[in-house]
Amino acid sequence: VFCYTFYIMMLTAEKQALLDFLNSHLALATLVGFIILCFWLIDLIALKTKAFASYRKYYEPVSRYALPIGFFLTLFSTIMSLVYSDYLGVLPCGLCWFQRIFIYSMMFIFGVAWYKNDRKVFDYILTLSIAGLIVALYHQYLQMGYSELIPCPAIASTVNCDKPTFMEYGFVTFPFMAVVTFGYTIMLSLTAKMFNK
């Protein structure tokens, strides 16, 4: 239903309706994804204190399919960022570009690794994800109204980093979506490394 509605709105060129649709639905998906991510993190931490055998049946499939899951997650993020900027005209700020660099890079790394079935890439993915997460958390910090610790890399023709383009539920912004995406790639990498037997 989401894909069909998205496709019809793109064909009919109702850009404002499409923007409202994407903002509300992606914000809800991000919120649900964040809740799942929190439970996943708590569960992986709990694995350190419990026997691995009882949880292995849940995490082995995630580990086995971590490359395609990561590829499609970063591909979706890439497509949505390009739809927002190139089709809907929502200009990215300087910090958004840094986050895009990390996500776009991971999409290609996941894609090539999946094609070659190379499971040794998770150290690289983890490094890119942590760096991207730091940028996204700082960007979210700015957009929640706190003062700059480091100047925004905005130039005259781009958007200012501390002005949210949209905000749903009082805290879901583009940087928060990136936080959740980087969180998932971190958890995928950790799960793949823990259960890569």
Regions found by a protein language model. Name each.
Residues 2-94, 103-106, 110, 114-197:
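Secretory/periplasmic and organellar redox-cofactor proteins
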Residues 97:
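Cys/His-coordinated zinc-binding microdomains
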